[in-house]
Amino acid sequence: LDNNFDFHYFSGETGSRGMKHYRYDILYKGMPVENEQVIVHTKNNNIFSINGTYSKNIKITNNILISKSQARGKALNHIGAQLYKWELPSEEELLKQITGNPDDTYFPEGEKVILRKEKEYYIAYKFDIYAHKPLRRADIFVDAASGEIIETIDKIYDADVSATAETKYSGTRT
């Protein structure tokens, strides 16, 4: 990898056989590359193996032409909620209690990332938007040049599927 790449440690664990596994995000020109990481496996403090998903040839196809604030506006318009979690003081207070961080907030600060979409790499703003009404949470990726929504990854799913089950006391139920 060339000098534009760097690694950022984000977690580690010890396996049942005493091997340690260290996970690193891949940074390109200081920005995290979404969905790409490297895992370093060690045994007795020696590197045993390395695996992961990354591209050696990142060619960014856009420039930064809009501000983070403009991108946030595009992301919020895309979600189109009536009410967001950060607008509710009780939700903000609960978050601070759960995390133990008095500065934590649901407000989507956003960050610049590199996102691969259909073999192209884009600089994008990534926002974690948590809507209260209607309930929805998603990572929204906004093209840093055009302001278009490149990708939406929902974090809350629901399903309503009919099924049949054989119950212990009530026989077959649908």
Where are these regions (language model features)?
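Zymogen propeptides/activation segments of proteases
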Residues: 1-174
